[in-house]
Every structure is written in structure tokens, then in C-alpha cells.
Amino acid sequence: MVDSDSARLPYFNASPAEVRRLCRAGESGPVTAGMAAGYIQANIVMLPASLADAFHEFCLRNPKPCPLVGMSRPGDYRLPSLGADLDLRTDLPLYRVWRDGNMVAETGDIRDQWRDDLVTFALGCSFSFENALTACDVPMRHLQLGRGVPVYRTNIACTPVGPFAGPVVVSMRPFRSHHAIRAVQISSLIPLAHGAPIQIGFPEEIGIADIDSPDYGDPTEVADDELPVFWACGVTPQAVLAASKPEFAITHAPGAMLVTDMPIEGYEDLVASHRGRII
């Protein structure tokens, strides 16, 4: 992505704490893509403590869609390992509240929904490697257009654990072939942001019948000279909640992540070694 494209992302070089303050004040906008480059962004799942052990094991058995970067104690809305001033109830742009597998509300503040038995799971997000791609001048159309990344349910089943089962969900970004190679190279180095893609070029092989109709996010055109590249996605737990129907849960809304203080390991060296390369 050229410098003028980076300039369209006003919080690209913001600190994670600054982004969280914006979220807390309701001033961040609904999507955290392109914010706080060099740091891990996280999908959030909050479940009753009675389900925490099973969901923890589910994450460990499904590390591509659910790369675990943090887990709270029951009832604790602080997660110091991910941010010193962090409040899990207010520091995301938008949350979803779930009852019996149905999404019943979206809100920017869950303090009135908070329960003392909730355990929070933070799962790495592809926005982290998107920022690395941006820094390495690899263009992404949804960012250029100010849209959400398109996200799809697949025919790939997660490894089930206890009550938790459901399909792997993927995000898609179209690239010309040389940029696709670089996207694979760079994302492979960030396993906590889903790592390498799981499919390139053939959406029908993973059960996506209409690439122009994503299940979440916004449609993104795939040009004739481009390949659709699919990564495992942290929206997977929301598809799992819909299938597994726990009595209560809270998640992030798609695109509305927790921006953590956890640095991407080796980020500066990664960018220095890949920026300006053709392949």
C-alpha cells in the first residue's frame, strides 16, 4: 500500500491505549482495522465460568480460527497481560450479547450486562497481519474503500469439544498473484493472527457458493486478474455459539476488536525485511 493509502488510516500509528480510550469514549468508529500497527488485536468471547474449561480446550484444538492470546479469571474485567488500563466492558467499539445461541443486542458498553461468573477469552485477529501488510505496501481493497472485510462460513468443521462445535469461518482478501505471495509470506510469520491462509483461489472447495454474498462484513470485488485468499477468522466462535446455544455469552461485533498492548513478535524486523520486495 502506498504512503497515500496509509494516510487514509488516521490511527495506524496510534498507541493501543489511545485506541482503547477512543473506544471507551465512543469515538473510535465501529471497526478497528488499520489501527495501532505492530500490536495484536483480539476477538473477544465471554462465557459463564461453567463453560470456560471446555471453551479453553476448544481454542487449543482449533488454533487457526481461535489463536488464544489471553484468558481472564471469572468475573474479572481487567486483563493486565493485554493492557494495563484495560476494561473489557468498555474498550471495544461494539459488542454482541447472545442468549441461547441468538444474538439479542449490540451495544458499545456492556457494564449493565456484566456478570460475576464471566470468563473472557481473547483470540488473535487478522487485523494484526493486515497492519503488517499495509506497512509492507501490500494493498487491500476493503481498507482502500473503507469497508469491512468480507467473512464467510465454510464447510470445514471445527474440532468439537464438549458443547462447542460448528463451522470454521474465514475472511477473504483479493490479491494479484505477486501480492498474494507476499501476503502468505508475511501472515505466516504471525501465528497469533491466524497465520497462513487456509485456501487460495477456489472458494467452492470450502463451501462458499457466492463470493459476492459474505455472511458477515461487506462484499469486496475480486477482479479477473486477482485471487481470493482466505484466512481462518475469529468470527468462528460466533458461528459456534449459534450452533451450540449456551444460555449466555458476549462477543465482539465483527470488525470491532480489542486492541491490546501485546506487540507482534519481530514486527519491526518483519516489516524491514519485506517492505519494497516484489515477492
Curated annotation (Swiss-Prot):
Belongs to the D-glutamate cyclase family. GO terms for molecular function: lyase activity. It comes from Gluconacetobacter diazotrophicus (strain ATCC 49037 / DSM 5601 / CCUG 37298 / CIP 103539 / LMG 7603 / PAl5). Its EC number is 4.2.1.-. Keywords: Lyase. This is Putative hydro-lyase GDI0188/Gdia_2258. HAMAP family: Hydro_lyase. NCBIfam families: PRK05463.1. It comes from the Bacteria. InterPro entries: D-Glu_cyclase (IPR009906), Putative_hydro-lyase (IPR038021), UPF0317 (IPR016938). It holds the Pfam family D-Glu_cyclase.
